[in-house]
């Protein structure tokens, strides 16, 4: 895959990473989410918004494209095609990471998808398109969408559409679901897992299980930051999945780190460890995060306003005789991430509801993640970020 990615697709991946870092900074600066563990899937949100852009016209399309950071809507679809077909292809049969990614378009029977939109959804995004009855069977359709997501995510995301979120005003739902399960190349010995102190943002501490290892690790220390790179077992292709742990030296440095990542687009690439180093001590807490948000306000903070208002233009999505157009009313997103001695299991889903308008390291180092840190799961050949989040207390699961 490394030699087949076109230049415009690589540029789109860079834009997707920039979008991920901006969103992470927005989440970290939100008082509610900053006080708890958080996780989200940039590739899930980016894909859902890219598919939304396929049905948008005029200024709405331009604003979606600008928010997602690419110059043309065609770049979004080219990236989606590469992500669906290659980056997130399942490699479990050859000993690599298990990956599943599915897109779905659920449209009310009173509307017809435009052939041009349906072609992009099916051919580029490999989306299932289904005609449903929101008018009289909203509860049944909610169960249908939730069951579809639950199946793709192996039961990790159960209710992407909250009870009562879909009613007879709903006209269309764009949804996707992502599942990832990867085993560490070098698994941690569970006998070495011991309780130790993790220091919280308020200065207090909790005891939590820490994994340990005597192995050399990919580690870089620079600019008041330590970056750990943990590889997952590779399958029969050239994809390389890694988890990155970004640990600020200052115990309270989480928010400033998120701001720096957002402000400097190449910050992550400049701080990727390239070599293994010997460690005196290595401690990484086990953690499990379930995180859900209604992301409309976060996206508005990034400059995406038009799709949510009465000026929204989604004339390229459906054929309709109704005088009103469509607008986005809700963007539901959920993510699950669990890290333990064997590896990582992660899942995510995004659902968009639409209604009618109204430096070189020293030879020996320590890595002790005993205070809040950022993490991300990335496929390194392409650079696509699958999951991202922060841990402020490993004992909190939701």
Curated annotation (Swiss-Prot):
GO cellular component labels: extracellular space
RCL as annotated region, ranges: 343-367
Entry keyword Disulfide bond: no
Organism domain of life: Eukaryota
The name this protein goes by in its record: Serpin-Z1A
InterPro entries the UniProt entry points to: Serpin_CS (IPR023795), Serpin_dom (IPR023796), Serpin_fam (IPR000215), Serpin_sf (IPR036186), Serpin_sf_1 (IPR042178), Serpin_sf_2 (IPR042185)
Known function: Inhibits chymotrypsin and cathepsin G in vitro.
UniProt keyword list: Protease inhibitor, Serine protease inhibitor
Gene Ontology terms for molecular function: serine-type endopeptidase inhibitor activity
Pfam family membership, one: Serpin
Protein family (similarity comment): Belongs to the serpin family.
Disulfide bonds: none
Site (Reactive bond): 357-358
Entry remark concerning the domains of this protein: The reactive center loop (RCL) extends out from the body of the protein and directs binding to the target protease. The protease cleaves the serpin at the reactive site within the RCL, establishing a covalent linkage between the carboxyl group of the serpin reactive site and the serine hydroxyl of the protease. The resulting inactive serpin-protease complex is highly stable.
